[in-house]
Amino acid sequence: MSLFPALRPIDNDLYVEVILQEDVPVVETSGHRPPEDLLELLKAAGVKTMHKCVSVRHALSAQEAGVDAVTLFGSEGGGHIGEYGLSTMILAPRAADALEVPILAAGGIADGRGLLAALALGADGVTIGTRLLVTEECPIHQNLKEALAAATELDTLPILGSLHNTLRAWKNPAALKVAELESSQADMREILALVAGTETKRMYQHGEVDAGVIACSQSIGIISETKPVYAVIDGMVREAAMIRDRLAA
């Protein structure tokens, strides 16, 4: 379960109530610092907590707040990448040197090469997102899966920087229009209309790939086919082990 900041008001207390009722084992929060009142409720119930952030400074705050692990999210990643422009290659070793809790590296990781690189940089594990979009189990429309599988590493762009909420998204007509509106200092309401969840729903539910905005990592350039989730995870582990053995030979 994930608790993320959003552009619209969200009652996280209701989410926590359901989390506790359903015995969710792990919860990830995101942002500058995890909400300590929610952390207390979760930890008292035995729920493991993780916090996703885009800087070591925020990771240290999360550690101080009492989370069990921290995810460092590099600017290659798909989604809200912050305003620092720091890559996973920099964040992972910095966090490994600075933190005592386990760290996960995220952003731009989609195969065994990325997994092994993250471990070499000091991470205890990785988080993957975009790779799981292009899987058999992912419930997005087949049109969108095929479009993402055909994309390259050049087919993403950061948007919403004008709202101080930078998001790396797939470069479709809707995302390009958002970038155009931002550069012309258009009314914020025009921008928000394009990134509304109702527009994104047209994309992932009905296959209208030109509508809406969807988070997408630069790792899309190394994703070329739809696979079962098991095959993705197993393939990553096997590839990482094979490269490790080759380097050790």
Report each predicted region and the residues it spans.
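Acidic, glycine-rich active-site loops and adjacent beta-strand->loop/helix elements
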Residues: 7, 76, 108-109, 131
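Active-site entrance/lid segments in N-terminal catalytic domains of soluble metabolic enzymes
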Residues: 1-98
